[in-house]
Regions:
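Canonical radical SAM enzyme core domain
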Residues: 1-6
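Auxiliary Fe-S-binding modules of radical SAM enzymes
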Residues: 8, 18-148
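Alpha-helical scaffold elements adjacent to nucleotide-binding pockets in ATP/GTP-utilizing enzyme cores
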Residues: 9-13
Length: 148
């Protein structure tokens, strides 16, 4: 019931995994709850942007080797800022509708697509996100490995 305890337990778990499997690539994501269709019980305001920033910065300090992903559930302003501080990955041009991408690529009708799983807060396209990252002084990296 306290997000700080959950964050600490997660960090310790990642630390333990890293000690046991030092060559494993580890990454964290902290998707905050967003309003859910037909669900009034979950309060997405329990963890604000300030608290999320606190958790992500603590992860960066305690787990400097770990990747940190920030989803499109967060606002564009928050994602632009956190990318400069500690995030290593941000999503762009996403869809949360069940079957939504399939509909786009296979010309299915809208009525074949399910409800969105959660609301997106940052709906920037890939191109817009790339442009915003560059304008913010960051170098977007799309691929940081080579297949041999």
């Amino acid at each position: 019931d306290d997000f700080r305890k959950d964050a600490l337990a997660t960090a310790l778990h990642v630390y333990y995994i890293n000690r046991k499997y030092p060559h494993a690539e580890l990454s964290l994501s902290c998707p905050r709850l967003r309003p859910i269709v037909n669900n009034d019980r979950i309060n997405p305001r329990d963890v604000g942007e300030k608290e999320l920033c606190q958790v992500l910065c603590a992860y960066r300090i305690f787990l400097p080797f770990a990747g940190i992903t920030v989803s499109s559930r967060e606002s564009a302003t928050f994602r632009n800022g956190i990318a400069k501080i500690c995030a290593t990955k941000v999503s762009a041009g996403v869809s949360t509708g069940i079957g939504d991408h399939e509909e786009k690529y296979e010309c299915k009708k809208d009525d074949d697509v399910g409800d969105e799983q959660f609301e997106i807060n940052d709906d920037r396209s890939f191109g817009k996100m790339y442009e915003d990252m560059e304008q913010g002084g960051l170098q977007p990296v799309l691929n940081d490995y080579i297949y041999v």
